[in-house]
Amino acid sequence: MLLSGVDTHLNGLGNMTEWTAPNQKGVPGYEGTLNKRVATLPQLLQGAGYHTYMVGKWHLGKQPDLIPAARGFERDFTLMQGGGSNWSDMGYPNPAHPQLTYMRNGQRIDKLPDDHFSSAAFSDFIIESVDEQKGDGKPFFAYLSFQAVH
């Protein structure tokens, strides 16, 4: 896996939460989240003096200690689910998740702008993040995970 550098069964993503079989529930490696047993690439890079930015779909854990801000990203604009509408905060036709959850820098966003389009918003956030901090001479790591491919 890109963010941890280890096999998915070591980082907790042996299966996505939605597809976890009954015999996998509670089994290490099948937590359905990027577990705390592994360090993330942004955590390591941040420790080496990098700026770290994350934009796009996360789908690796919604608990406060698992969101991008807690896993080494100093700035983020995140869709917490694995996909949904590209133009609004409407989720997939699923009664359990009728509305998407977006976060910015670890804080929930209550309403998206009326002209929201995911790819443009994600690209703009990365560009703004780099531009705002480019003068300090520090390197950066930017992780961009578009949802529009869904």
Residue ranges and their predicted role:
Residues M1-H150:
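Formylglycine-dependent sulfatase
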